[in-house]
């Protein structure tokens, strides 16, 4: 029989009771996490979002409550009245906040029963993710996931407090908007009233927040959901959340200063950690040169070194021919890895091939010098020069890639990260920030044979590079900046184009005709002609930031109801077929799978 709550009122959360509460009469409510019958006394760990409390049913104290406790099973919802008492000597649990006390129960109500669980809710038990996602309402009871989402809520609160305190207004932008497919595919929403026409769910509030600046709101922010219909990876979701900000009458330094303050406040209030300000900066060119990527993880070394000048005249034809053909030769020193087996090196070779490299040359530095199939092709002077460039010592493993610059940097940059995983160099409790600046404005898309925006089409070129936009696009740098944390881009922003002529030129360089630009972005181009302040902003990926703050391995562990890598919600079974009547109302019909 199920009891009614009646006039009982909870007095405390389970996980908040300490020795200071000894002697208090309390009312607790929660889930029976674990029940233990000691042949007289019955112990139940009662759980809520704040933690566990041990409750004790003693027949000498309340025979009725003890009888009711005999029916309690895991995940029953229970309410108890009782007195906080010290635990007996030798039974204190120092791992729990409540570990010094227990509650001697005088009355008990069973408010709801539970079926047998499909999996246990202990954090340390490994459960298939699909099973967890199918029963997400149970999965979310696990303390580790509850802690993740509670921390997420705290980050949102701190963000709102900080930004409103710095003059930002929290303003909302539309979810039903115009499709402007530049990059990822849009999620489309058919209009019933305007048959044959569609809304799109926003990939970001970019255009609307710029228009808010044109409208004179000066400082805007929003913790906003965004949508992209793209192939998913471990750190991607079709719907994700951004901390979105925009400011008027500012330059890059103003934005960076304010946003560094936000990051420092979040880490101070949520992690009790100090972020050293100002955050280190690095240009895009330096980042690519030293680390092969534009989102370097600075928790470890393994920097890339340039060897082209040393090997261009060498007897090793593979290297010499690459340099003669306009390519480069770079490498990295895997310190102390000279003992790697041939199979392990072959695995690394297969890894770099994923990123376009044709192979991976290697050298083991031994007591007798270089040990490698390629050693014989180099002079003693060349070996000495490379040894110095690598800062190589006995026991090191030197790894080389020769190819086009992009292939070399991509493959070695990814190899650097892979080696860090293999060597255990990734400390989740270390947080290393860096701003990457001075990105290229445009890059050549070899497949589509046109220029593409490195960030997005609304990013302003450097003032001194404006003349290159049309005449030498590859030389033009952008007023763009990314904030990188432990190899993850957690924020990206730029100063925006605030002149209609420059924006129209940018669209032209991206291959949009004047008619296409007007059709897709006419409302922005029109707005730019009515007095637009210099403005810029940034968007932080909230999901990814929380993933790093909590040390989670997957972004799905910091989102309450995430999708799978196939974009499905296993709990609600979305997406799903819809009624034919609904499709007819929209003027649609499906063509099958």
From Swiss-Prot:
Q: Does the keyword Lyase apply?
A: no
Record's keyword annotation contains S-adenosyl-L-methionine: no
**Which Gene Ontology cellular component terms are annotated?**
cytoplasm
Q: Any idea of its EC number?
A: 6.1.1.23
Which reactions does this protein catalyse?
tRNA(Asx) + L-aspartate + ATP = L-aspartyl-tRNA(Asx) + AMP + diphosphate
Q: Where does L-aspartate bind?
A: 182, 228, 455, 496
User: Which keywords describe this protein according to UniProt?
Assistant: Aminoacyl-tRNA synthetase, ATP-binding, Cytoplasm, Ligase, Nucleotide-binding, Protein biosynthesis
| Superkingdom of the source species | Bacteria
What GO molecular-function term can you cite, just one? ATP binding
An example GO BP is: aspartyl-tRNA aminoacylation
Subcellular location(s): the record lists: Cytoplasm
Task: Note the CDD domains from the entry.
Answer: AspRS_core, EcAspRS_like_N
Feature type site, description Important for tRNA non-discrimination: 38, 90
S-S bridge residues: none
Region described as Aspartate: spans on this chain: 206-209
* Free-text function comment from the UniProt entry: Aspartyl-tRNA synthetase with relaxed tRNA specificity since it is able to aspartylate not only its cognate tRNA(Asp) but also tRNA(Asn). Reaction proceeds in two steps: L-aspartate is first activated by ATP to form Asp-AMP and then transferred to the acceptor end of tRNA(Asp/Asn).
Question: Which family does the record claim for this protein?
Answer: Belongs to the class-II aminoacyl-tRNA synthetase family. Type 1 subfamily.
Query: PANTHER family annotated for this entry?
Result: ASPARTATE--TRNA LIGASE, MITOCHONDRIAL (PTHR22594:SF5), ASPARTYL/LYSYL-TRNA SYNTHETASE (PTHR22594)
Query: What is annotated about its quaternary structure and interactions?
Result: Homodimer.
What is the official name of this protein in its record? Aspartate--tRNA(Asp/Asn) ligase
Name the source organism: Geotalea daltonii (strain DSM 22248 / JCM 15807 / FRC-32) (Geobacter daltonii)
